[in-house]
Amino acid sequence: MIIESKKRIRREYQPLTTAVSLKILTPASPAGQIYDPENNEYIPDREITPLTILPQVFADAADGSWTAHVANRLLASMKWYVNNVDIATLPSWAGLYSIESTGDLRGAITIFRNVPVEEKIELHFEAVIPDMRIGVNIPIKTETILLSTLDKAEDTYELSIGDDPVMKYNPFYDRLLMYDYKVANGI
């Protein structure tokens, strides 16, 4: 009689280390805009030149067991947040953004919305990387990026003196005027 015994070979994996950053992929459309009130236009106009931001996700394990160093292809549960609110739940953003769901650009957001001058937008990205080696999900969260618009209105200048706004001048106390009078008359 042959007795078979099954033995498990356990492998210990090093933990996954991750690095995340945000990269603007559109040099013609930066995070900041300029609003020209005379022509009623945004520079750049994101309806014409949209802004694309990529969350770059890098992952590695010290033992070399992780092969996907650029981990964007593996991202799951991707969400972009506008001022700490999920962008998918905001009606003011409906149809004004798209999120890439395939390839090395997975997770990249393309924004077609102009930011009003009075509004500041803090944008950040959250997702998970499934680590199949040990069966856990590694959470990913980026730093925030600020989207804002500068008003290009005419500058208003004002000139003032740092002293009393009402200047008082008494010619009788002005000794220079007395000196000029004496020199002119030979006194």
What residue spans do the PLM features occupy?
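Ser/Thr/Pro/Gly-rich low-complexity disordered regions
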Residues: 1-187
